[in-house]
Amino acid sequence: AASDVYKRQNLKSYCELDISGSKSESNRILILKSIFNNIKINNLSSSDDTSVLNHSLQNLNENIDVGHAGTSMRFLTAYLATLENKKFIISGSDRMHQRPIGLLVDALNSLGFKVNYLKKRGFPPLEIIGSKNLHHEVVLKSHISSQFVSALTLIAPSLDNGLRIILQDDIISKPYINMTISILNKIGVDATFEKNLINVKPTKKINDIIYDVESDWSSVSYFFSMVALTKNLKLSISDYKKAVSYTHLTLPTRLL
């Protein structure tokens, strides 16, 4: 697996590597699967962040600890706020409690949700009291983290009137926002992102769908260097495909 440790001196002349699904795509589709329970996911990421999110969604306890998983903290905060008449406390590691989440909390509260700080204002841990939103438009500064934007965009189809998100300031990590919109469109949700405006229509149900997460080819870049620096090493990379077949890429002994 891509998470295994490979030491150069212990490598054989031929190695096989299986690539798991993209973490970014996996985390987004997991939230949507919790909203629309007729989504089946193939090739889910094996990353710690995705495992934490998946476990938390399948075991919605009153106290949720995401450890170091930053994406889980942000996506879960938005999702849990929509679960009416339920109360949650979401926390993480000491390092997680130093990572700001104020912009997302302010946006959720401005929509009518109920999210409170338990310690330092602007930072986890949080108390979330699931409720119904009162408004369908929010202004969000987008220069800090695109994950705040994606967190709101992912819950938007479950809201009675959908959601309009007006982005202020420079939009960072725009490709990740585009990814979120693309996934929504792929499962049948009407969502658009034009200039500084995201518009997501309310969606009560979607057609049954089998969602294949793209393999995380970016994680393979480290192994390219390993092959280039190791004599007589061949590496076969297996990529998940819809027909349960695999594509094998055999790298040359030297890339230099």
Protein language model features and the residues they cover:
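A generic, well-ordered mixed alpha/beta core segment in the N-terminal half of proteins
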Residues: 86-118, 125-127
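Single conserved hydrophobic/aromatic residue that forms the stacking wall/gate
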Residues: 1-6, 248-256
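Flexible, glycine/charged-enriched surface loops at secondary-structure junctions
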Residues: 115-118, 188-198, 233-240, 254
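Active-site-proximal loop->helix
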Residues: 53, 103-107, 130, 180
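Structural motif
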Residues: 3-45, 58-98, 129-172, 201-243
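Conserved loop->alpha-helix
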Residues: 53, 244-249
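Aromatic- and glycine-enriched pocket-lining scaffold segments that form the walls
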Residues: 170-183
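Short, conserved phosphate-binding/catalytic loop or strand-edge motifs used
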Residues: 121-132, 198
